[in-house]
Amino acid sequence: MCLVCIGVVMSARMQESKKGILLKPKTCNTNADCAKFCKGPIQNCLYHTCACVPGNPHCC
């Protein structure tokens, strides 16, 4: 087993997760606002922060 290879893969994945932190959820005032950024299910999006970031399909 190649320990150096494993370290390279793990460091690449850590860099990917750090980039993901920059993708902040969108603040939406209405279901329509949320729908611009999110794909289903969209419910009760009044002055909420959409949980819609890549990898999380749910809105409010």
From Swiss-Prot:
Disulphide-bonded residues: C28-C45, C34-C50, C38-C52
Domain of life: Eukaryota
Biological processes annotated in GO: defense response to fungus; killing of cells of another organism
Cellular localisation: Secreted
Main location: secreted
Keywords: Antimicrobial, Disulfide bond, Fungicide, Plant defense, Secreted, Signal
Signal peptide segment: 1-14
Cellular compartments per GO CC: extracellular region
Protein family membership: Belongs to the DEFL family.
Protein name: Putative defensin-like protein 279
Species this chain originates from: Arabidopsis thaliana
